[in-house]
């Protein structure tokens, strides 16, 4: 990642240390009894934990909340998925207990699939990002593509992402692999050295 992040031309400033961004590890996407629960979440979370341990506090956790304006197409969306049309403080939208200790920073709460935007950029600046979370085929890919458009350097840890099912996960990973060099698809073993502090 050092070579990919690189030094800016003519600059002696070293690149910023990468951050881990964990997308939406919430009950609604993780619980086996949720209509949107990912069967891949337990295995992916084990890798998320490894990445967070390596990042030494440079971790942001995001949360999707059902607060979008119902006068827009989000109203149609929640009409199609009435089980999810609940108040933002419903336990369905809580971060899963095992993810609450991943980050020392406040959770970034947004009503959009994609989490890339000024709220996130204010915290991490231009640092490279390792992306993980759930679901690969919705909020992860939406975040990754917006990050690519913004000029971010993003590594997707594929085995630290959980799709709605394995086929949809694989399809989303394939799409994200079409966006080098902004997006790089890797696995946890390859992403760990990017996050560990330099000696």
Language-model features, listed with the residues they occupy:
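A short alpha/beta connector and helix-capping loop motif
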Residues: 16, 33-65
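N-terminal nucleotide-binding beta1-loop-alpha1 segment
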Residues: 19-25
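Short, glycine/acidic-enriched loop or turn micro-motifs at the edges of active sites
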Residues: 27, 66, 162
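Short, hinge-like loop/turn segments at secondary-structure boundaries
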Residues: 39, 76-80, 172-175
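Active-site-adjacent betaalpha module
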Residues: 2-19, 47, 53-57, 83-199
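Acidic/polar short surface loop at catalytic or gating sites that assists cofactor/ion binding
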Residues: 68-87
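Short acidic, Gly/Ser-rich segments with clustered Asp/Glu that frequently serve as metal-coordination loops
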Residues: 26-32
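Active-site flanking residues adjacent to catalytic metal/cofactor-binding acidic residues
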Residues: 23, 62, 158
């Amino acid at each position: 990642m050092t070579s990919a992040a690189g030094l800016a031309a003519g600059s002696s400033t070293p690149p910023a240390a990468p951050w881990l961004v964990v997308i939406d590890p919430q009950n609604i996407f993780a619980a086996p009894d949720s209509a949107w629960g990912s069967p891949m979440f337990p295995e992916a979370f084990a890798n998320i934990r490894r990445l967070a341990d390596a990042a030494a506090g440079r971790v942001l956790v995001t949360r999707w909340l059902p607060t979008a304006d119902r006068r827009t197409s989000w109203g149609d969306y929640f009409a199609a998925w009435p089980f999810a049309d609940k108040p933002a403080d419903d336990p369905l939208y809580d971060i899963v207990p095992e993810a609450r200790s991943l980050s020392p920073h406040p959770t970034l709460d947004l009503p959009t699939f994609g989490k890339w935007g000024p709220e996130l950029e204010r915290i991490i600046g231009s640092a490279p990002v390792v992306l993980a979370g759930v679901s690969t085929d919705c909020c992860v890919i939406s975040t990754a593509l917006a990050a690519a458009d913004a000029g971010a350097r993003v590594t997707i840890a594929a085995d630290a992402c959980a799709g709605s099912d394995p086929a949809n996960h694989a399809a989303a990973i394939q799409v994200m692999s079409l966006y080098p060099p902004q997006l790089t698809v890797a696995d946890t073993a390859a992403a760990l050295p990017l996050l560990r502090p330099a000696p």
